[in-house]
Amino acid sequence: SVIIDAVGKIGNGEVEINRITKTVLVIDEAQDMTEDEFALVEALIRKNEDLKVVAVGDDDQNIYSFRRSNSRYMRKLVDEYGARTHDLLVNFRSKKCLVEFANRFWETIPERMKQSRIISHDQDEGEIRIVQYQSPNMVIPLVQDICATPLIGTTCVLTQTNWEAIQVACLLKDKRMPVRLIQSNEGFRLCDMDEMRFFNRILGSQAEVHLIDEVCWAEAKQAIKNEYCEAASWEICRGIIQNFEQLYPCKYRSDWETYLFESKLEDFYAVRGETIVVSTIHKAKGKEFDNVFLLLNDNRDLLGDNQPVTDEKRREIYVALTRAKNKLSIHLN
């Protein structure tokens, strides 16, 4: 991979020192580092004696082990490099009872880096409902409950699998509820979208031109709007372009290409109050909603049965619980 090759070249002295001389290295979502990514961090540390490393992360939210990520690499910065830890303990998102509920749940997660409880900035009480089923047939009653619940603000239904998310979205649509299914771009890059290919063709691809001309950019924006404004994908395309404009006032072609390569489709779904968002827990990480309905089908282990539960699954559920701002409704069997 690119990262492994980079680590090898840095270690062998094949990279010009000015290309890797850094003063500060900031690692966001540090709990999701893989072995290769941590090897790159270590290579940069070895080549920069005075390098300051700032790692921002929450080991309770490491839910991407299927991508070989592990929070132990963030912990290594403390254990092997003597990094100091600063716990950010005030929650500005959720109502008081939701924060307390999440606190009680994370007590079941072993070997956590944080030991102090989270404190809610908002002292108003929210609402928690737990609906227990005796059957695995939970999707239809869940949808009925959603339709019968007065909803104010943004709403999301969280599921554990894509198939559950599709079922919920289809049933809500059948009930004539405004719904949006969050999908991901696993298996392809945003630059491979037909809409982005069209945009890039209008933009031009002269390799010798590093800075994108503002006139060309505006023409490409107008062209993609004219071509796709009636398409279901237009809102996502507009979000991709607008977000890049906010991040990069000076539009370099290399920045645009890297941005399309690294961005995830689920980051550009607009959330409107009247639309019910349906998503797997993994795709909703980093997002927040006023109302959250959580479908936990067949997690009998949480009810005290003998079926084992992994730490990964507990962290996944913790992530789901902490998406809610005001109301949390858990449907489980």
PLM region descriptions:
Residues 186-200:
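RNase H-like two-metal-ion nuclease catalytic core shared by retroviral integrases
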Residues 11-19, 139-149:
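Short amphipathic alpha-helix with an adjacent loop that forms part of the alpha/beta core around
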Residues 1-25, 33-43, 48, 257-280:
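Conserved helicase/translocase P-loop NTPase motor core
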Residues 2-5, 167, 236-239:
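Amphipathic alpha-helical interaction segments
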Residues 24, 31-124, 134, 141, ...:
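Conserved helicase motor core of SF1/SF2 NTP-dependent helicases
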Residues 199-331:
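Conserved helicase C-terminal RecA-like lobe
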